Swiss-Prot record:
InterPro entries: SAM-dependent_MTases_sf (IPR029063), UbiE/COQ5_MeTrFase (IPR004033), UbiE/COQ5_MeTrFase_CS (IPR023576). Belongs to the class I-like SAM-binding methyltransferase superfamily. MenG/UbiE family. S-adenosyl-L-methionine binds at residues 73, 94, 122-123, 139. Its EC number is 2.1.1.163, 2.1.1.201. It comes from Francisella tularensis subsp. novicida (strain U112). GO terms for biological process: aerobic respiration; menaquinone biosynthetic process; methylation. Keywords: Menaquinone biosynthesis, Methyltransferase, S-adenosyl-L-methionine, Transferase, Ubiquinone biosynthesis. GO terms for molecular function: 2-methoxy-6-polyprenyl-1,4-benzoquinol methyltransferase activity; demethylmenaquinone methyltransferase activity. Pathway: Quinol/quinone metabolism; menaquinone biosynthesis; menaquinol from 1,4-dihydroxy-2-naphthoate: step 2/2; Cofactor biosynthesis; ubiquinone biosynthesis. This is Ubiquinone/menaquinone biosynthesis C-methyltransferase UbiE. Methyltransferase required for the conversion of demethylmenaquinol (DMKH2) to menaquinol (MKH2) and the conversion of 2-polyprenyl-6-methoxy-1,4-benzoquinol (DDMQH2) to 2-polyprenyl-3-methyl-6-methoxy-1,4-benzoquinol (DMQH2). It catalyses: a 2-demethylmenaquinol + S-adenosyl-L-methionine = a menaquinol + S-adenosyl-L-homocysteine + H(+); a 2-methoxy-6-(all-trans-polyprenyl)benzene-1,4-diol + S-adenosyl-L-methionine = a 5-methoxy-2-methyl-3-(all-trans-polyprenyl)benzene-1,4-diol + S-adenosyl-L-homocysteine + H(+).
Length: 250
């Protein structure tokens, strides 16, 4: 079946394959200005710990080339700029122009200049040379990609041999009671907060649904192997609400 006739998940709704990207773009254009505030409110600030652990496991060193993909408002990119120094380079990339503009303004105001570039790009067809990056991160972005397999293969292509991909993403809670509480919170509190803070409950309803449709820990691990990565491992965080997957290219 051609992609023109295929459907895919947009939250719990099936939409034509080619429409998902437009719908996801609408979500993030809507929430970009309040994205950081909502992250703090939704996660009670815990997202900062998840990202800190991701940075600690990235292995990024001075002189590295790093791609922060679907990097949004630049939380990871800012730290990577400090880690690579002026000898290295960080590319903050996002498919959404509104998110990228917020990230650029935020990082510029924090003094992150000289070793960072901003590139609007689709993860499924990255506009970078083969074997270019030492490290790629994608934080809370993969679940919004239409063709995840294609995106993972594209990431593998642009990684140097010996390079690593880190995927930080919502996953499947491994504690039954936590899963029930998390469901209640996600489907009731998130849209409510979205309505109050961004005047957009529907976008946060989609975000809650998209988490449930994202591949679980083992499925994503196998997808990374299938895309060409080796030694893929994952670490559950906060009882599996979030998982960090790491894969290497050899």
């Amino acid at each position: 079946m051609s992609k023109e006739n295929k459907t895919t998940d947009f939250g719990f709704t099936q939409v034509p394959w080619e429409e998902k990207q437009k719908k996801v773009a609408g979500v993030f254009h809507s929430v970009a200005a309040k994205y950081d505030l909502m992250n703090d409110l939704m996660s009670f600030g815990i997202h900062r710990i998840w990202k800190k652990q991701t940075i600690a496991k990235s292995g990024v060193r001075k002189g590295d080339n790093v791609l922060d993909l679907a990097g949004g408002t630049g939380d990871l990119a800012y730290k990577f700029c400090q880690m690579v120094g002026q000898q290295g380079k960080v590319i903050l990339s996002d498919i959404n122009s509104s998110m990228l503009e917020v990230g650029k303004e935020k990082l510029t105001n924090k003094g992150c200049v000289g070793n960072i570039e901003y590139v609007q790009a689709n993860a499924e067809c990255l506009p970078f040379p083969d074997n270019y990056f030492d490290c790629i991160t994608i934080s809370f972005g993969l679940r919004n990609v239409t063709d995840k397999e294609k995106a993972l293969a594209s990431m593998c292509r642009v990684l140097k041999p010996g390079g690593r991909l880190l995927v930080l993403e919502f996953s499947k809670p491994i504690i039954p009671l936590l899963s029930k509480v998390y469901d209640e919170y996600s489907f009731k509190a998130l849209p409510f907060l979205g309505k109050i803070i961004t005047q957009d409950a529907e976008s946060y309803k989609y975000l809650a649904e998209s988490i449930r449709k994202h591949p679980d820990q083992q499925t994503l691990k196998q997808m990374m192997y299938d895309a060409g990565f080796d030694n893929v491992e994952y670490q559950n965080m906060t009882g599996g609400i979030v998982a960090l997957h790491i894969g290497y290219k050899y």
